[in-house]
Amino acid sequence: MDQSTLKYYSDNAAQVAERYESVVSDLSAHFADAFSKGGKILDVGCGSGRDLADLHKLGFDCYGVDPVLKFVEIAQRLHPELENRIALGKLPDLQVPFNGNFDGVLCSAVLMHIDIEQLPATATAIKSCLKVGGRLLYSVPSKRTDVVGSNRDANGRLFIPDQAVRLNSLFSSIGFTEIASWTNSDSMGRDSVEWMSVLLELQTA
């Protein structure tokens, strides 16, 4: 994952977590339909633990990883029900956590921070976490007008445009099939941002 992006999240973890916790993710409305009931789910880039806590409330056997130690600490403090269910881990060099064999992987607002050349390794790492028939639900921006020519916002975070197009082609090449995709507005109410969400299923090992 991009180092400048990681530094921003580490330096501003408390403020970012507060923003995350103040809104409900539009993606959470799809969790129950996207993943098998009671399935083992991994949230990659779980941040404040908001989505992970929602998965837990829905009865999923859920776990999370995040590359920012402060986020791991904040998530476990805000959501004590997630104790021993969150660990450090980052893409693309993610080691399969919590004994793997997941029924689902969630990557909400994460994959746009991955350099294009790291996408193949990222896709392989995600695939290695899933069992055949498992599903991946991810979201990336379909619009972000505050990102300039360098593909970075004012805070220095990397936002690769059109990432969904690359990702869908890449995941298709390693055994995934698209189940559904949709666009939605920004849960934080930012007019400059819209999201593309994609649900994929792993068909072959």
Question: Which residues are covered by each model-predicted region?
Answer:
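A conserved beta-strand element that flanks and buttresses the S-adenosyl-L-methionine
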Residues: L106
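Short catalytic micro-motifs in class I SAM-dependent methyltransferases
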Residues: A109-H113
